[in-house]
Amino acid sequence: NDIFYQIASFMNNFEPVRWRWSHSLHHSYTASIDPHDFEVEGSIFWAPKNLFNFFIVFVPGISLIFFHKSLHKEIIWHALGLETRVMKECIPDDKKKDCINSSRLFVALWLVIIFCSIIFNSLLPILLFLLPKCFASLNMVWGLTQHMGLKEGIKDHRFSTRSIRLNPIFSFIYWKMEYHIEHHMFPLVPSHNLPKL
């Protein structure tokens, strides 16, 4: 499981140590202000009273334009050993070095992919390994449905989380995470078993 977690984290630009701890906090304090739930901000561009920022996340490739607000920037900061707010508030002190090392590995892999593209005179490595997440607007739609517009700062997942229905193809792509209340109530159940709950 851990190997696939590492691969999926790289594919989604989620540094795995940071993601493990921020996601644990997200399950404990869904839609909470204090402690801050970094995963329910809607997106890196979301601000509660700014409708433009809300809709801009659906523009394919927008994270390339707003790089300074992206998870890429956070990974680079961590790779440089800089402590971000999410690192301070979510990651235990004894795991921060793991986060820094993992971020350095991510940056090294990005550079290797770019180097391979230059050496082979082909954009294919970049198109296959670096850009797909930047154009995954459909996943953003599904992700935003999980908590947006629901109660904040409440411990009962039935009020801060929702499940939705997806067709079988989208359900496969989304790894059955449309069963999101079930995922929050039973986080250790593998995603393929969520429909059985």
Range-by-range predicted roles:
Residues 1, 19-31, 142-151, 173-189:
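Histidine-centered catalytic micro-motifs
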Residues 2, 139-144, 160-166:
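Active-site Asp-x-Gly
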Residues 3-6, 121, 153, 177:
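General secondary-structure edge motif
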Residues 6-126, 191-196:
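Non-catalytic, topology-defining segments of multipass membrane proteins
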Residues 6-17, 132-136, 165-176:
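Membrane-embedded alpha-helical segments that form the functional core of polytopic membrane enzymes
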Residues 15-19, 63-71, 128-155, 180:
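Transmembrane alpha-helical segments that form the membrane-embedded catalytic/substrate-channel core
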Residues 107-110, 114, 146, 150-153, ...:
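N-proximal short alpha-helices
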Residues 155-197:
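Long, positively charged, glycine-interspersed low-complexity recognition regions
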